[in-house]
Amino acid sequence: QAPSYAPQPQPQPQAPASAAAAETAYLPPVGQHAPQPQAAAPAAAATAADPEGDGPAYGPATVAGNTRVTDAQRARAEGRSPIIEPGMQPAALTALLGLLLAGTAELGVYGLLVPLVVLQGVTAAGWFRLNGMWPARQGIALGFAGALAADVAVLAAGREHAPAAILGTLGVWVLLSLVLQLRSHADPDERMYGLMASVAAAALAIVATGYLAAPPDAVAVGGAAVAVAVLARSLPLPAAASVVVALLAAAGAGIAVGGMTDLGAKGALLGAGAAVCALIGHRAASYDYPSRFVHFTAGVALPLSAAAPVVWMLGRALG
């Protein structure tokens, strides 16, 4: 019988496996060192959302700088002078309001009452904002109500008794402001500061009633003189030169408008006196890094309100 042999296993070809291993030998391992953009993005967002330290958080970059920084804040940060003058736009509004007072004075007291009430309201609001107290609805309403009460008192008493009507209203409103501040639960220093601001706002708004008590010719000259003086003061000139130009321009306006009325050349004195008070009010509205809101309230109204007593007194004396 012929011997039988078991089949011997045949070796498998290794070339294809070796080629595949060679092709994958230098491929990077999957899942170990590949970049992870999804994980990096939240990390970057977290880093951006959490600024270093306790420093201030800044807004997004803009082409023209940070729009939230006002001129007053920039001047304070740079250590510049706290005096920032209102500029030409508030001066133009002051001139417009002054010309309205001058134009409506010849229409009678009720015609004059419309721009006067606007002046008194802006005066009360501007003084509170100038003192950094905002919102101050109660104080503004109190000062404006005092001005309206003074207007009614002058209309009821007549121009002959206008000083008593104005001073009486002012005394009542000072007492009322004191009572309201005593009822406040704020700190003593804060109450005193609020009392002074309330009394000053009411006083300035009430004093503006002097236009209602002054002769119509004096109101016409005074309103025109203040308008010209404030515009001249806002010209791009050195401070001393602009003051001189403003006073001379106001005196010239007084002569021009006085020539149309019974005051004549005496209008120069009234115009110069009104301009001096207007420039004081203009300077007050420029103090302590004022904002644009201050410029468009106190900067508009204070020159005219400050000139009202002089317009009344010189109008009575020269008329």
Named regions from a protein language model:
Residues G98, L116-G126, G146-A150, W173-S177:
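Central hydrophobic cores of alpha-helical transmembrane segments in multi-pass inner-membrane proteins
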Residues Q181, H185-G259:
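Internal active-site segments that recognize and position negatively charged phosphoryl groups
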Residues G79-L93:
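N-terminal membrane topogenic signal
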Residues W134-A145, A165-G168, D189-A200, A241-A250, ...:
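Cytoplasmic-side transmembrane-helix entry/capping segments in multi-pass membrane proteins
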Residues A102-L119, R159-V174, T209-V226, G264-V276:
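Structural signature of hydrophobic alpha-helical transmembrane segments
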Residues Q1-A72:
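Intrinsically disordered, low-complexity repeat regions that act as multivalent interaction hubs
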